[in-house]
Amino acid sequence: MFTVIIPGRYASTRLPGKPLADIHGKPMIVRVMEQAKRSGAKRVIVATDNLDVVRAVEQAGGEACMTREDHHSGTERLAEVIEKYQFADDEIIVNVQGDEPLIPPAIITQVAENLANCGAGMATLAVPIVDSKEAFNPNAVKVVMDAKGFALYFSRATIPWERDRFNLSHDEIGEHYLRHIGIYAYRAGFIRRYITWEPSPLESIEMLEQLRVLWYGEKIHVAKALEVPGVGVDTQDDLIAARAAFRALNQEF
């Protein structure tokens, strides 16, 4: 069994008030919460810094935890919730991003089960990249793994770099590119240790907080997601796309 915590920071530079953005009649954070509840999690908690978000979650029958506004990352917000609820060190926590209203419940379950069985401090997921534009897009985080499925590195750069192919053209890519999905599973004790580590140089360069884990010698297990998640919402255009996706599904989530 596992617990899902959904960080729902209210302030957003590109999309202010994002957690409460309406998607087919419900706030986005409620859409994410409903997907998480379908994963089989024993508990789903929304961690936010805004009372309006708390009210929206509770009105929808969910559980919300009010957290500080000064956290620098979703992981720090999770750590506050873990301390408030006094979760045991071995409790499996799945961090589901609050801007993923179309996240498949199956992959939430998948990442929790992978953590339970892989022997790493942290587990996450990835999906194949088939489009060269995505491979060269710095907003699409790439990951490379070793033979046992443990992450070697995450980067905004195109990794691995196909020297011979890319010397000729950037229009086609091979079949070995993976895009990291921002879903994480870890035990509560691991998060308690993580927040005591100083940010690493690589993390600061790439602006990817998971690189802190590799920097300090911990392992991250990466598996291919059982399902490809729908659009995440980071901009107004993303929000329009998410609304269209829900309309196309023609069902209430």
Curated annotation (Swiss-Prot):
Its EC number is 2.7.7.38. Pfam families: CTP_transf_3. It catalyses: 3-deoxy-alpha-D-manno-oct-2-ulosonate + CTP = CMP-3-deoxy-beta-D-manno-octulosonate + diphosphate. It is found in: Cytoplasm. One of its GO terms (cellular component) is cytosol. Keywords: Cytoplasm, Lipopolysaccharide biosynthesis, Nucleotidyltransferase, Transferase. It is an enzyme of class 2 (transferase). One of its GO terms (biological process) is CMP-keto-3-deoxy-D-manno-octulosonic acid biosynthetic process. One of its GO terms (molecular function) is 3-deoxy-manno-octulosonate cytidylyltransferase activity. Pathway: Nucleotide-sugar biosynthesis; CMP-3-deoxy-D-manno-octulosonate biosynthesis; CMP-3-deoxy-D-manno-octulosonate from 3-deoxy-D-manno-octulosonate and CTP: step 1/1; Bacterial outer membrane biogenesis; lipopolysaccharide biosynthesis. It comes from the Bacteria. Belongs to the KdsB family. Activates KDO (a required 8-carbon sugar) for incorporation into bacterial lipopolysaccharide in Gram-negative bacteria. PANTHER family: 3-DEOXY-MANNO-OCTULOSONATE CYTIDYLYLTRANSFERASE, 3-DEOXY-MANNO-OCTULOSONATE CYTIDYLYLTRANSFERASE, MITOCHONDRIAL. This is 3-deoxy-manno-octulosonate cytidylyltransferase. The gene is kdsB.
